Amino acid sequence: MADMPSGESCTSPLELFNSIAAQGELVRSLKAGNAPKDEIESAVKMLLSLKMNYKTAMGEEYKAGCPPGNSTAGSNGDPDATKASEDFVDPWTVRTSSAKGIDYDKLIVQFGSSKIDKELINRIERATGQRPHRFLRRGIFFSHRDMNQILDAYENKKPFYLYTGRGPSSEAMHLGHLVPFIFTKWLQDVFDVPLVIQMSDDEKYLWKDLTLEQAYSYTVENAKDIIACGFDVNKTFIFSDLEYMGQSPGFYKNVVKIQKHVTFNQVKGIFGFTDSDCIGKISFPAVQAAPSFSNSFPKIFRDRTDIQCLIPCAIDQDPYFRMTRDVAPRIGHPKPALLHSTFFPALQGAQTKMSASDPNSSIFLTDTAKQIKSKVNKHAFSGGRDTVEEHRQFGGNCEVDVSFMYLTFFLEDDDSLEQIRKDYTSGAMLTGELKKTLIDVLQPLIAEHQARRKAVTEETVKEFMAPRQLSFHFQCFCFDT
């Protein structure tokens, strides 16, 4: 694929070999113990992904009992090489053994994207005339593909549009789910462009133990939370895959074109699919790719095929869009541009991202003030010392403290955040005080969101989800003849 990283692997082959052996043992033990099918399939996917990484690094297939030589470049006892092998990121799994979380600099190299640097942030500020969002200022959105092309288009008064999405797997969304929508709302405001939001209820039906009716009902409930973020109904189209596929021939035609240009071998290598996966899973990446092309939305862009889109998303979704970027020029479309965010850590620590399937790892948008306080106090991983005396003497570690991490996402004032960092690091602020600060930020944030959501009616949802013409700044440029 054109956009796959081509540099040297960041992983020690010996460490990767050992990981494959250990994962193989896990798969065998799960099968022998008659573990749930989903658990076995997840383990098998991880095994195949590890083997693919090994083949890329070594140029040959993994062979059990035949470890690579220990003199491979990059091993040499380098702790960074070992750490890289312990970071695992794909669209379904995020895992690291480091309490600091994923090494995003190495992930940029691994995925072949570009770092969002100060120069790019300054250019965004000049183009929009607006102060950069805190997610940009603090490196929460840290990586991109072709953002300079988007800015070129904007500065030359050429149109582009935003595309993001949500896989609705439960009625309640959590704080981590808010991150891309908060940022996308800011992008919509400062660039004054249309936005399409894909609700991939078909994906959740294929991957989860859900009925079609349940998957669609989650779409409607999640759409209410998304609308409550403040999107402009005149510039925003939210669509259900289950619903829109039958309403838009242009959308389905793009899905079929993508399917024709991507082989099973490619998607197996990208996503780790196995022979036991249903064909719906294998073909789904084309459905997630299709909104990247403007003529998938004829009510908005008519038959224009040349309007580029910008996709804000977490970096675990990048494999879908590396595939999309490879296909785009072959079917007559510009490559989508991307802005990648870091992961929102679980309460228990940055080794994994927040998950809706674990209520103790997540703060939900439906939680009460009492529940928020209890979860932060009981479950938020602390970077503090074992005793007050030690903490006062040596200070806390903000790099692993979840409460501080959450404040970097949600506390707007940079000076206040920096003062908290200094106080906690010096020992002047205790863990309990830091957690109280976070609670004082989260409780009103979620209460205000709940109030906005309560005002979202079924009619409001229908209005956002109706295929229709949108109103936006560059509309006249889209339809000039």
UniProtKB/Swiss-Prot annotation:
Pfam families in the record: tRNA-synt_1b (PF00579), WHEP-TRS (PF00458)
Processing and modification events after translation: Proteolytic cleavage generates 2 forms; T1-TrpRS and T2-TrpRS.
Keywords linked to the UniProt accession: Aminoacyl-tRNA synthetase, Angiogenesis, ATP-binding, Cytoplasm, Ligase, Nucleotide-binding, Phosphoprotein, Protein biosynthesis
Gene label: Wars1
Name the record gives this protein: Tryptophan--tRNA ligase, cytoplasmic
Principal EC category: ligase
Species of origin: Rattus norvegicus (Rat)
Subcellular location(s) per record: Cytoplasm
Coiled-coil region(s): none
NCBIfam families per the UniProt record, alphabetical: trpS
Main location: cytoplasm
